[in-house]
Each structure stands twice: as C-alpha cells, then as structure tokens.
Amino acid sequence: MGTSLSPNDPWPLNPLSIQQTTLLLLLSVLATVHVGQRLLRQRRRQLRSAPPGPFAWPLIGNAAAVGQAAHLSFARLARRYGDVFQIRLGSCPIVVLNGERAIHQALVQQGSAFADRPAFASFRVVSGGRSMAFGHYSEHWKVQRRAAHSMMRNFFTRQPRSRQVLEGHVLSEARELVALLVRGSADGAFLDPRPLTVVAVANVMSAVCFGCRYSHDDPEFRELLSHNEEFGRTVGAGSLVDVMPWLQYFPNPVRTVFREFEQLNRNFSNFILDKFLRHCESLRPGAAPRDMMDAFILSAEKKAAGDSHGGGARLDLENVPATITDIFGASQDTLSTALQWLLLLFTRYPDVQTRVQAELDQVVGRDRLPCMGDQPNLPYVLAFLYEAMRFSSFVPVTIPHATTANTSVLGYHIPKDTVVFVNQWSVNHDPLKWPNPENFDPARFLDKDGLINKDLTSRVMIFSVGKRRCIGEELSKMQLFLFISILAHQCDFRANPNEPAKMNFSYGLTIKPKSFKVNVTLRESMELLDSAVQNLQAKETCQ
C-alpha cells in the first residue's frame, strides 16, 4: 500500500513529542510568570523609590499650582515633600531638585547623567537647534562647549590686554549711562532706569562680540532687545508650550506666543548671521582678532585647515553664529537684569549705598575711576554684589535639564529622559546656610577681619553648576563689578518716595523688577568720566 507525503498531509503525532511540547509550554509559562514577577517587583521598587509629589490633575497636571513664581511654589512643595519631589506639567513628569545637597549630588557628582536638555519645542527653535545652551548633551556638544569656554577664558580673563579692552567698553557705556540717567533726573525728576540699563549692557556685549556699539535711540537695536522678557518666559521652567505641545494645533494664546517666539528667534539669528558674514568678509588673513567673533572664526578656520598648533578643542565654523548668539543673548539679558537689581537695592537700602561709596572713596580716591585692579581692596563692594545675587536670585530656576541614564538622587529613582528643574533660589534662601535669608545684608559675606569670605561667595548659586555651568560667569562678574563701582563712585541714587515699598516682578528665566523710578545726581561732575573716555579714545586712535 503506497504512502503519500504531500505538503498538505499532516505529520503523524508522536506521543513523546506531545509530552515535550507540553513541557516546553509549561516551562515557557513559568519563565514568563517569573520574568513578569521580577519586572513587577522592580517596577514596584522603582515606584516606591520614586520621588513623592502632589496629586496631578488630568490634562494640566500641577500647572495651576506652580503659577508664575515657580521657584516659590517649588520651595513650598519641598517643605512638604522634601528636596527631591515630582510634579506633572501637562503630560510631562518633572523632577524638581531643591537645596545644595540634592543639586550638588545631581549636577556635580553625577554631572553627565543630568547634563542633557529636554526635547522641548522652544529649545529646538533657538539658533535652529544649534544652540549650546539649549542643545542636547553629546560628544560633539562637549567638544564645542570646551572650545567656546576656552576661547572666552583666554580672550578676557587671562590676557591683560583683553581685560583692558573690556574695561574700556564698560567705561564708555557707564559714562553714557550716567549722562542719560542724570539728564532724565533733571529738576528732581524720577525716571525708570531699566530701558537704559538694557542698552548699556547690550552695547558692552556688542562691542565684545562684534566690535561696535549702538545709540540708545537706535530703533532697530531697541526692538531687538525688547523681546528679552518674552524669550525668558518661553524657555523658562514650566513654559506651557513645552509641556502641553498639543496647544500648538489650534488657535489659542499659547500658540500665538510660541509663533511670536519663533519670529523673534529668526530676527535675532538673522542679526547675528549678518554680523558673522560681515566679519568673514572683512577679516584679514594673519590679522589679530578685533573682537570675539573674529577670535571664534579664526579658531574655526584653523580647525578646518587641519592646524592643530596650540592644541585644545576648536569650534566648527558653522557653529560660530549659534555660539555667539548664546553668549550675546544670554549675557545681555541676565546682566541687564542684574544691574537693575543693583540699582533697585541701592535705592531701597541707602545705608548700603553710602557704605559702598565710602569704601570706593577710601580705596580709589576722587582723582580716578575704579578699575579691575581695585577689586581685591574693595571687599564691601564685592559683598554687595554677592548679596545682591543671593538675595534676588535673579536666575531662580536653571534652564531645564534632562537625564541621560537611569539614576538616583538622595535615594530616589529617576529614569532616563526625565525632565529636571533645578531650583537655585532654594539654595540662596536656605535658612540653615543663610541666617535670616529674607534680609538684605552684604556684611554676611565679610569675615571678622572685614575681608571677603570666599567660602560663602562660592555657595551663591546663580550661574548653575556642573556640566551646564555658564561659560560667561567670569566675564559677567567682571562687568557687574565695573558697572556698579563706576556708577556708585560717580552718582547718588534716590528712590521715589511715592512708590509703594512692596515691589512687583515679572517671572521667566530671570526675575525682573517691574517699573521703578529713581533720581540720579552726580556726586561731583562729569569731568572725570569725560576725561577717562577721551583718554581711552586717544589710545585707540594711536593703536
């Protein structure tokens, strides 16, 4: 009897095969259950070790509870849930770090794990995604940041000639600022100093980056600078467009703000790109750099040509405009905000202003202007600067971070790709580190001998720490010291007695004082400032 082995005929079943199959199925089920139990236990452990936090409402999460003054909301929540807690903004889970211990453990001890930026829509817009400040953490990012930091350090803090150039830029703008403040205060009038400080600081950074300055009346320059507050609100912690991206898909105020944000970034990028192209065209081969843009272009061209002389990392040429955008944009905004705080505090604490002026008169005298060389001998001026930074915490929460790997802080599990907010304000207002933190007291930074306490100054957190620490920190502190020293040496500042004692502020990436009025009078005359600027111009003409 013949047999057929057609592909359509079933194979005969062997009883042993049935037993083996049953055993394999049973083992598979047991293995699946075992793995599932392990994963469930691991998930439960992670949930048990996840940071605590408040109940989050559907759709909006904790957005309503955070409000505008996010740093204060975070500090209040930290008192209930601890220094590491979790909130939800929209559908985005966010871990918030408060206090020096938690922040140091995350950003310094585990710097690489917390060095990324979230994939936020607003971050992708800045400099077309090439921004160092808002860009993702990668090997390429590390090389570019190291190059930019090295260039800034060498260009302004290590070379005496470059430091003198910076002092000259600040002197010129301080002279113009004094003249405008005094003119606006004629006949006992009071004026809002904020617009003038914005242009003054931006002009210093324009001279540093591009080798040029603008008139305070220049409409295009003033328009460019007028969007600082809008930019800060959009990229700051808790921006709705980033945590509720679905708001971009139908008409609403958030979408309108985001489209305006896109336009202002295009305008700003075009402004920087125009400067970059003009510098590339006018830069002579072998010439010394005229400004920071030149220095970055020359470094990038050497890298492109394969010149490794001098070693160290170098910027890619295509990244120069974005890097200059970061330096110019961030510096002029944060420094003008800081200078506004310094003037506000002078008027609200006249005894502090008097003591600053007395120290300047004693150390510098009345026959010349303060300079960087005077800084070691002006401890109270430095104490005033650091107390102003601590008290105002004008950058209350850093640009949002993101984790690059599964990690933990103070025993709490934080998964990879988690958005992290860092509350710098909580460090600067910690009552365990700063007695009576809500009191403004520069003397807290002086030791028993009246010298600056460097251990305390290092605890002030305003420029972040770790891998994302601001590369312009030294340059910023130099400018603030020079500005406030020259202004205090030359002028008296008086508050408007009709203004309420309680101040109002706008919140975003920085805390900005809202409108306040001052009266500014010369302590002597403009002669010393005029003479110093004329001498500076004469030296520049001879060079």
UniProtKB/Swiss-Prot annotation:
One Gene Ontology term of the molecular function aspect: monooxygenase activity
Cofactor: heme
CDD domains, alphabetized: CYP1B1-like
Phenotype for A119S: In allele CYP1B1*2, allele CYP1B1*6 and allele CYP1B1*7; significantly associated with breast or lung cancer; no significant change in 17beta-estradiol 2- and 4-hydroxylation activities and 17beta-estradiol affinity; 1.5-fold reduction in testosterone affinity but nearly no change in testosterone 6beta-hydroxylation activity; 2-fold increase in progesterone 6beta- and 16alpha-hydroxylation activities and 5-fold reduction in progesterone affinity
Site (Major determinant of CYP1B1 17beta-estradiol hydroxylation regiospecificity): V395
Residues that coordinate or bind heme: C470
Catalytic activities: an organic molecule + reduced [NADPH--hemoprotein reductase] + O2 = an alcohol + oxidized [NADPH--hemoprotein reductase] + H2O + H(+); 17beta-estradiol + reduced [NADPH--hemoprotein reductase] + O2 = 2-hydroxy-17beta-estradiol + oxidized [NADPH--hemoprotein reductase] + H2O + H(+); 17beta-estradiol + reduced [NADPH--hemoprotein reductase] + O2 = 4-hydroxy-17beta-estradiol + oxidized [NADPH--hemoprotein reductase] + H2O + H(+); estrone + reduced [NADPH--hemoprotein reductase] + O2 = 2-hydroxyestrone + oxidized [NADPH--hemoprotein reductase] + H2O + H(+)
Effect seen on changing E229K: In GLC3A; juvenile-onset; hypomorphic allele; reduces the abundance of the enzyme
Recorded GO CC terms: endoplasmic reticulum membrane; intracellular membrane-bounded organelle; mitochondrion
Cellular location(s): Endoplasmic reticulum membrane; Microsome membrane; Mitochondrion
Tissues of expression: Expressed in heart, brain, lung, skeletal muscle, kidney, spleen, thymus, prostate, testis, ovary, small intestine, colon, and peripheral blood leukocytes. Expressed in retinal endothelial cells and umbilical vein endothelial cells (at protein level).
An individual GO BP term: nitric oxide biosynthetic process
Record entry for activity regulation: Enzyme activity is increased by liposomes containing anionic phospholipids, phosphatidic acid and cardiolipin. Inhibited by naringenin with an IC(50) of 5 uM. Enzyme activity is increased by cytochrome b5.
The organism's place on the tree of life at top rank: Eukaryota
Purpose of the protein: A cytochrome P450 monooxygenase involved in the metabolism of various endogenous substrates, including fatty acids, steroid hormones and vitamins. Mechanistically, uses molecular oxygen inserting one oxygen atom into a substrate, and reducing the second into a water molecule, with two electrons provided by NADPH via cytochrome P450 reductase (NADPH--hemoprotein reductase). Exhibits catalytic activity for the formation of hydroxyestrogens from estrone (E1) and 17beta-estradiol (E2), namely 2- and 4-hydroxy E1 and E2.
Disease connection: Anterior segment dysgenesis 6: A form of anterior segment dysgenesis, a group of defects affecting anterior structures of the eye including cornea, iris, lens, trabecular meshwork, and Schlemm canal. Anterior segment dysgeneses result from abnormal migration or differentiation of the neural crest derived mesenchymal cells that give rise to components of the anterior chamber during eye development. Glaucoma 3, primary congenital, A: An autosomal recessive form of primary congenital glaucoma (PCG). PCG is characterized by marked increase of intraocular pressure at birth or early childhood, large ocular globes (buphthalmos) and corneal edema. It results from developmental defects of the trabecular meshwork and anterior chamber angle of the eye that prevent adequate drainage of aqueous humor.
Protein name per its UniProtKB record: Cytochrome P450 1B1
Underlying gene: CYP1B1
